[in-house]
Amino acid sequence: MKRVQHYLLDEQVPAPFYKRSQVADRCNGLLVEFREGFALEFRLYDDGMAYRFLSRTDDEVTLRGERAPFLFPEGSTAVVPYVRDTPQQHEGLPFGEQFMQSFENTYTETSLSAMDSTRLAFLPLLVRTPGGERVCITDADLESYPGMFLRRAAADRLEGVFAPCPRRIVAGGYDRMQGVVEEYEPYIARIAARQTLPWRAMALVRNDAELAQTDLVWRLASPCRLDDISWIEPGKAAWEWWNGWGLYGVDFEAGINQRTYEYYIDFAAANGLRYVVMDDGWSAGHHRPFETAGDIDLPALVAYGAERGVGLILWIGYLPFAGQMEELCAHYSKMGIRGFKVDFMDRDDQLLTDFVYEAARTAARYGLLLDLHGIYKPTGVQRTYPNVINFEGVHGLEQVKWSPVEVDQVTYDVTMPFIRMMAGPVDYTQGAMRNAVRENFRPVNGEPMSQGTRCRQLAQYVVFDAPLSMLCDAPSQYEREEECLRFIAGVPTVWDQTRVLEGEVGHCIVTARRSGEVWYVGGMTGWKARTVHLDLSFLPEGTYDVELFRDGANARRIARDYRREVLTLDASEGLDVELAPGGGFAARIVKH
């Protein structure tokens, strides 16, 4: 050991495009310098701790591995997002077949000692100790380094596992848009001179509600590297893929064509939506991204949208984008496109995390947003490059289109905000107007439905963090549901203040958020009906008008049943709201 340095941080940091406008960054820090050419840094916060290694050499270093053990008391339990089965095989490489996957799965609750030691878990992962502590483990500031998986190494111990650096990558997967690793190097990373490694971050709290409102990952991320962020506009988007371009009652054939996209633009403009996402199908082919399909005239659509205050975001596969990133960004930025939704990355090795930062930098130079799908969890790039506006890495609403009927999306909805969302925002793509109770749910790709009630879908716009948020259903569906549409379209996507009023992992969550002088509250339950007491004492003193959407009297049988009420209440009062099984509620609160 060469030197030990203690330090304190205590500052309020502006947080644009986030769940609060200011983040309190207060911690005790410890930096330990070693003679062997590296340092180890610790930070201790009120709601967590983190550590990271720092290279102190002036040379590149090859790392063959990293030890990251996490030891827990006997009797601890875990809420685990296992990787899904994958077809890749790599003889002699433990877990090699599990490194390529989409980071989308439901959670498995288990005792730590019974966790499947043959399967990796992706992060974040939650452990509960017998003493009542909650420990949520994730990465932060993951740049030019592989992401961490966890495996059970002993009855009471988890250990980090890291994908080796790819040696040979070939085009494969869906229409050859994915980079499939056929051969790995015998090391996990090449570290540049004086590079800082990612933080190993652990939220440490005593109740579930604190998990859903921690700022730990955002605090640990590198500060913004863009001089000008005034061009970055969060907001909502009309989106066609989930609903299958499902317009009806119109005088043209709906599909991937000019008339359909003009209709989506008109719908977005009429309802104050900032964007239309043009998903898979707009181009002449996945590997022909400079050409459009059918009669689509993209410059004309850009102009049509610009006249109405609506921007366009284009979907594109990972390899077609990575192979000609500069040319695509230059071409479509000049045309007036506002961003790309990049899909099918499905890895988090060093080369892929390098790609994410290169894409963020390149897109920012051309004034373009990025919405990353088929991607690992957020680790802070959204602070460093805030044009990276949202992430998938979530078992989102698209899953109900094809998952087995037994899939439990409702329980996932009240688990994910405490675990996955502690890492950052989620492009869950909510907003279904076809809703089903448990016994009526079926996966239907062409005309999909959600699990749970209509009000649950409304609540998700308040509960889920999403600076770019989709309206997943067809305009024709929303136009029949004017009250719900008006509420959804009006919910902000970034906030001045966020408070989780009530929460229990896997059972319920109630979140209050403020934008300016207006408050929104959203609540959801699992499959168990419950009564939520909405205590309004979080509001400043005074009288308030409350617009409330609550499950209807028959929502237990007919999930789309809801009631809208307008109430006048004092901040000293409370309100009991009954939630049906799989139910929810949403409220808008303004000063009377």
Identify the role of each PLM range.
Residues 1-219:
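N-terminal accessory beta-strand-rich subdomains and adjacent acidic, glycine-rich linkers
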Residues 188, 192-267, 271:
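An acidic-aromatic substrate-binding cleft motif
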Residues 504-541, 545, 585-586:
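Carbohydrate-binding surface patches
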Residues 566-592:
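C-terminal beta-strand-rich structural cap/linker in extracellular carbohydrate-active enzymes
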Residues 369-374, 399-401, 467-478, 495-499, ...:
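Acidic/polar loop patches that form or flank catalytic/metal-binding clefts of enzymes
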Residues 473-520, 524, 556-560:
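Glycan-recognition and catalytic regions of carbohydrate-active enzymes
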Residues 53, 268, 343, 370, ...:
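Conserved, mostly hydrophobic/aromatic
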Residues 278-453:
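Aromatic- and carboxylate-enriched substrate-binding clefts and catalytic-loop regions
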